[in-house]
UniProtKB/Swiss-Prot annotation:
This is Sec-independent protein translocase protein TatB. InterPro entries: TatA/B/E, TatB. Keywords: Cell inner membrane, Cell membrane, Membrane, Protein transport, Translocation, Transmembrane, Transmembrane helix, Transport. It is a single-pass membrane protein. One of its GO terms (biological process) is protein transport by the Tat complex. GO terms for molecular function: protein transmembrane transporter activity. Residues 103-115 have a biased composition (Low complexity). It comes from Shewanella sediminis (strain HAW-EB3). Gene3D superfamilies: 1.20.5.3310. One of its GO terms (cellular component) is TAT protein transport complex. The keyword Mitochondrion does not apply. The gene is tatB. Residues 86-132 are annotated as: Disordered. The keyword Ribonucleoprotein does not apply. It is found in: Cell inner membrane.
Length: 132
């Protein structure tokens, strides 16, 4: 992380920070700076991941166009693998959602949190009223 900065430079920055900010504000400043650095690293990594994903999609698209121009016959193994990946991705997108079968034996009564909260509120309101 500190490739171009040596130990003496870091020590000088620390001493200057201590003199300028003081001992009370220096730890807070260091924490906020490290938070900013972490946020920038996360943003850079997410941008890098998105670019890699877009490049992969673009490569698959180019392979598909190349395979289409060859008539889907006598394809190289790389092109055939790309087509197989595209087919599996298309099947996963077109696959309907799996609906889980809920049997009545598994649950004895329907769960409804709203009436329970209302009953709790009514009970607490009734306990606060004076009797008489």
């Amino acid at each position: 992380m500190f490739d171009g900065i040596g130990f003496m430079e870091l020590l000088l920055i620390g001493i200057l920070g201590l003199v300028v900010l003081g001992p009370e504000r220096l730890p807070v400043a260091v924490r906020s700076i490290t938070g900013w650095i972490r946020a920038m690293k996360r943003m850079a990594n997410s941008v890098k991941d998105e670019l890699e994903q877009e490049l992969k999609i673009e490569e698959l698209h180019a392979d598909l166009k190349k395979a289409e121009s060859q008539g889907l016959k006598n394809l190289s193994p790389e092109l055939q693998e790309s087509i197989d990946q595209l087919k599996s991705a298309a099947q996963s997108v077109n696959r309907p959602y799996k609906v889980e079968d809920i049997s009545p034996a598994s649950s004895s009564a329907p769960v409804d949190p709203a009436p329970t909260e209302t009953k709790t509120a009514e009970t607490s309101a009734n306990s606060e009223k004076p009797n008489g």
